[in-house]
């Protein structure tokens, strides 16, 4: 249950890295300075801050799982599709790690790119340049996090070519976002317009807030959907705090 389950599924651990790594890095940094600051930080978070994540949810399961979570009293349920692909070109040119001073660029260029799509601007995202996706974009559009803009020297109007499974998509950057990675919501560096992306092979990531006392209910959910991996943030924080006392 939780991180132990993820550890047994290396591929799932890799899949969830983009959405959760920055949040959990922040947690670990807080843990280093001691449980007092950690407890203070927890009290300052909004009461309905997401404290659970579901990983590897299949599209055909999403509605039924959401209904069960709603029956348990889950709040702030946020789901986004997750596709795994590769960044093939920027403005028609194959990117090379040595062309960028930011060392993190190599990971994106040589590894996988995890992306999503959404009709509306997701929670914990703020539009800082450009416009959000139209109802029916004539050509594929992309929205990138500011980190990508800085790392790859991107600007509005640039094109990104992506390979996802057997599909290839070339999207024009129409907006730049600033993401609150400490929000404990499902977030992505790269979002595509839904009309262009919804046919891509994908799973679903979900975040939600559920009060304590539902461990048995969540265990039952995991048994009924054995492909799911559940991360209980409260349990992780408790263990971090206890380990530091």
Can you name each region flagged by the protein language model?
Residues 1-245:
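Alpha-helical transmembrane segments of bacterial inner-membrane membrane proteins
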